[in-house]
Curated annotation (Swiss-Prot):
It catalyses: L-glutamyl-tRNA(Gln) + L-glutamine + ATP + H2O = L-glutaminyl-tRNA(Gln) + L-glutamate + ADP + phosphate + H(+). One of its GO terms (cellular component) is glutamyl-tRNA(Gln) amidotransferase complex. It comes from Zymomonas mobilis subsp. mobilis (strain ATCC 31821 / ZM4 / CP4). Heterotrimer of A, B and C subunits. GO terms for biological process: translation. NCBIfam families: gatA. It is an enzyme of class 6 (ligase). GO terms for molecular function: ATP binding; glutaminyl-tRNA synthase (glutamine-hydrolyzing) activity. Pfam families: Amidase (PF01425). The active site is at K78, S158, S182. Keywords: ATP-binding, Ligase, Nucleotide-binding, Protein biosynthesis. Belongs to the amidase family. GatA subfamily. Allows the formation of correctly charged Gln-tRNA(Gln) through the transamidation of misacylated Glu-tRNA(Gln) in organisms which lack glutaminyl-tRNA synthetase. The reaction takes place in the presence of glutamine and ATP through an activated gamma-phospho-Glu-tRNA(Gln). This is Glutamyl-tRNA(Gln) amidotransferase subunit A. The gene is gatA.
């Protein structure tokens, strides 16, 4: 018999609706799995009361014939989303005990649709990182292991807790946020599916800000179909977010089709970068062959300015972060350090020195530097010009094709600690994901295979603005042909 924890979002939703099992049974199964997986350190805070309360409501709604779109589906929530009455930390000591008096729009939509919350998921501190090693609550450990090797691996970042929890089947799906690849890279590292929607498609209200012109929430799940079902609930205009796009939310799940015959798939030549592992190159070719097999036409395209994307991103994102993180000063909430005999300025300095981690401090310093009077034009303005050129490159490419197919990451998951001392090597993890973020485009990663060490590898699909449907459809075609069913062997 299939274990309930083996089922995805839509299977659980449909099973509860048919009466195959109760929402309470589902919640209890995932809560048990979570309690047995402390070694992964995927959660910062567990919320069994919320999951069980929502399950009880779902069972009552089923009895009265009033089921909602996600009734009884338990989810993991990245601890960057403010949850009314539940501790929200952004994985930082500076707001260690912050309990929001309000709900983020995304979680409000999910809970109103009947979903429950198993817990708040670990992440890189303030979503700044690519390996989940910058969390003040300890790093998340990937459920995956290399063949014959017990070395602890990164689940990716910043949504590492979300990726690890879904891959280990502690939750059927989770929310993530993506600023420069923080949904797509960890999804690729852990063999799950992750979707970053068009910038503005999902509300940022109540999501603790990293870089406001880049941050975008999205779903992480076991399948393309599950991502489509979740995105339908998460997306939508929100007047509380000034960057929210006022457009209709399509019925992505119902319109899902793997028939991509006649679609033009662009292959950007600039994504063949130095240092890309041969296994990634061959995986990309396999993906191209799968798209051909599905009836799509393959077209070579050029994105000439993407070679500068990483440099531009690591100027723009820290600049915005330095502004956003200026609000954490120890006055109203969170950590407060007051040196004996010190004044207000001393309290600010001591609080921020003690409360922020090294990577956050590094990015605040970079951001403050590039925004300073002497360097604003030389760095920040130049980076914004590059960003505009990258967006134009994508526009030109999409005149010739419908979707772009690229690698998701330059390597498979690496060992924890391997790149921690070298920020540049760590930043290079985002080389394939950052360009779509700078252009605000929808993009998703789909698991396609394993490398020789038995670790998952994914490919990325990038679409036109607000054309998540084409991305999902191409993702489904890839998913069906890849037939990826590998799971991590339980060691935790």
């Amino acid at each position: 018999m299939t274990r309930l924890t083996d089922l995805g979002v839509t299977d659980l939703r449909d099973g509860i609706a048919k009466g195959d099992f109760s929402a309470k049974e589902v919640a209890e199964s995932f809560l048990t799995a979570t309690n047995e997986a402390e070694k992964l350190n995927a959660f910062i805070t567990l919320t069994p009361d919320h999951a069980l309360k929502q399950a009880e409501k779902a069972d009552k709604d089923r009895a009265s014939g009033q089921l909602k779109p996600l009734s009884g589906v338990p989810l993991g929530i990245k601890d960057l989303f403010c949850t009314n009455g539940y501790r929200t930390t952004a994985a930082s000591k500076i707001i260690d005990n912050f309990v929001p008096p309000y709900e983020s729009t995304i979680t409000e939509k999910l809970f109103s649709a009947g979903a429950g919350m198993v817990g708040k998921l670990n992440l890189d501190q303030f979503a700044m990182g690519s390996s989940n090693e910058t969390s003040a609550f300890g790093n998340v450990i990937s459920p995956w292991r290399q063949k014959g090797d017990d070395t602890a691996l990164t689940p990716g970042g910043s949504s590492g807790g979300s990726a690890a929890a879904v891959a280990a089947k502690l939750v059927p799906a989770a929310t993530g946020t993506d600023t420069g690849g923080s949904i797509r890279q960890p999804a690729s590292f852990t063999g799950i599916t992750g979707l970053k929607p068009t910038y503005g498609r999902c509300s940022r209200y109540g999501v603790i800000a990293f870089a406001s012109s880049l941050d975008q929430a999205g779903p992480m799940a076991h399948s393309v179909k599950d991502c489509a079902a979740l995105l339908e609930v998460m997306a939508g205009f929100d007047p509380k977010d000034s960057t929210s796009v006022d457009v209709m939310v399509p019925n992505w799940e119902k319109l899902l089709s793997s028939d991509i015959r006649g679609k033009k798939i662009g292959i950007p030549k600039e994504y063949r970068v130095d240092g890309m592992a041969p296994e990634i190159e061959s995986l990309w070719q396999r993906g191209i062959d799968m798209m051909k097999d599905a009836g799509a036409e393959i077209i070579d395209v050029s994105l000439p300015h993407t070679q500068h994307a990483l440099a531009a991103y690591y100027i723009i994102a820290p600049a915005e972060a330095s502004s956003n993180l200026a609000r954490y000063d120890g006055v109203r909430y969170g950590e407060r350090k007051t040196p004996e005999g010190g004044n207000l300025a001393d309290m600010y300095a001591a609080t921020r020195a003690a409360g922020f981690g090294d990577e956050v401090k590094r990015r605040i310093m970079i951001g403050t530097y590039v925004l300073s009077a002497g360097f604003y034009d030389a760095y920040y303005i130049k980076a914004q010009k590059i960003r505009a050129l990258i967006a134009r490159d994508f526009e030109a490419a999409f005149d010739k094709c419908d979707i772009l197919l690229t690698p998701a990451t330059p390597t498979a998951a690496f060992a924890l600690g391997q790149k921690q001392e070298d920020p540049i090597a760590m930043y290079l993890n985002d080389v394939f994901t950052v360009p779509a973020s700078l252009a605000g485009l929808p993009a998703m990663t789909v698991p396609v295979g394993l490398n020789e060490q038995g670790l998952p590898l994914g490919l990325q699909l990038i679409g036109k603005p607000l054309d998540e449907q084409s991305v999902l459809n191409a993702g489904l075609a890839l998913e069906e042909r890849a037939g990826f069913t590998s799971q991590p062997k339980k060691w935790w």
